[in-house]
Amino acid sequence: MEALRRAHEATLRLLLCRPWASGAASRPKPRASEVLTQHLLQRRLPHWTSFCVPYSAVHNDQFGLSHFNWPVLGANYHVLRTGCFPFIKYHCSKAPWQDLAPQDRFFTALKVINLGIPTLLYGLGSWLFARVTETVHTSYGPITIYFLNKEDEGAMY
């Protein structure tokens, strides 16, 4: 898994950072997990949220995770996460902790079997249609995240 993660990062660095462009690769970036946590905190721990964060804006520290628990200030979220170039897509639902390892393996296997083609198409669709934005404040500065739909604060669904 480590070799796959390194190959993935190298490919993204070439596609997104363009190391031949000045300063693009040297800018420090927050971890994707920090953006996830800060977004949930900024939204005051919503019942659910679904958003995209550009690969180019974060360090992908959650590589290989597809479905997992994410605790934030006493609340727990079930997070569905996938890389859908040029974004990382998150769907978070507040729910009690449970063992999500079988689903995590299942969703990861689906992505591998499908060669990532559906997630690539979803990412390109998101790139075309995600027009609602929000700024997430991180320890590395502001990060813009994208939504396909405007989310109503406090909505259950």
From Swiss-Prot:
Record GO cellular component, one term: extracellular region
Secretion signal span: 1-23
Presence of keyword Isomerase: no
Keywords per UniProt: Secreted, Signal
The UniProt record lists the keyword Amino-acid biosynthesis: no
Cell compartments where the protein resides: Secreted
Superkingdom, taxonomy of origin: Eukaryota
Protein name: Uncharacterized protein C15orf61 homolog
Organism: Mus musculus
